[in-house]
Design a protein with these regions (language model features):
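Short, basic/glycine-rich phosphate-binding loops at helix/coil junctions
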Residues: 36-38, 115-122
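Catalytic metal-binding acidic patch
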Residues: 86-92
Length: 241
């Protein structure tokens, strides 16, 4: 009987601890920039790996990036040829624009900055995926053109972030000036780059750039559909290699 009591007390303690942890996570989410900008419910973000990865990365940046900054999530940037390309996170900083491609993977990632496809390795399984540096170069190019049309010609930094489920990140970055890191080191890497940059935007200009990009976060359904189909096509191509 005493054993059963001990088991029940242990189970109750674990459940209580889990409830308190979840409540604390929900409170933190409600106060986050990600929630304020996207309006998404915690449960939806928690159940979606992509959204959860973007949220975890943005939390790190929100807490530790120095200087004035704004965040824009999931902007659909128009392409010259028609259609659009979707950015994960754009950080508008007084010293420039940081275009962040977020990957919520686990296991190992291997590749080279100048190779078109990289490897994602899990126990007993390997798959290829499109080089996120190349992917983000497209985002930067279209974003540069969009802001240029509004008279803004700003320094832009490409940042590739893998969430901390990736235990080994083996990528040779020779020839690339992009930032590549896991999410727990994203803020320190970006702060290091910021120390080499000069201020280019005042508060009013930052707000204007924010408004330009924020207007791109609520596309018509067919814009989202076209972007999803292009992503699926690219992934199918990677799977054949």
């Amino acid at each position: 009987m005493e054993t059963w009591k001990a088991v029940l007390l242990l189970a109750a303690g674990l459940l209580c601890g889990a409830w308190r942890w979840r409540s604390r996570e929900k409170r933190r989410y409600r106060r986050s920039v990600y929630r304020a900008e996207t309006g998404k419910q915690y449960k939806k973000v928690e159940e979606n790996r992509g959204m959860d990865g973007e949220y975890r990365t943005s939390l790190e940046l929100e807490k530790r990036i120095r200087g004035r900054r704004y965040f824009v999530f999931n902007a659909y940037i128009p392409c010259r040829s028609g259609g659009s390309t979707e950015t994960d996170i754009v950080m508008i900083h007084e010293k420039g624009i940081f275009v962040i491609e977020n990957k919520n993977y686990c296991g190992q990632v291997r590749g080279r900055a100048n190779r078109e496809y990289w490897e994602h390795i899990l126990p007993g399984k390997r798959r290829t995926f499109y080089n996120p540096i190349y992917q983000n170069q497209g985002h930067v190019r279209h974003l540069r053109r969009l802001l240029g049309e509004h008279g803004y010609h700003l320094p832009m930094v490409s940042v590739i972030v893998f969430n901390d489920g990736v235990k080994r990140l083996r990528v040779k970055m020779a020839g690339s000036d992009a930032i590549l890191c896991r999410s727990r080191r994203a803020a320190s890497k970006i702060n290091r780059r910021l120390r080499r940059m000069e201020q280019v935007l005042d508060e009013a200009e930052m707000e204007e750039v924010y408004g330009i990009l924020k207007a791109q976060t609520r596309p018509f359904w067919w814009v989202r559909y076209g972007q999803r189909k292009r992503a699926e096509k690219l992934q199918k191509k990677a799977g054949k290699i």
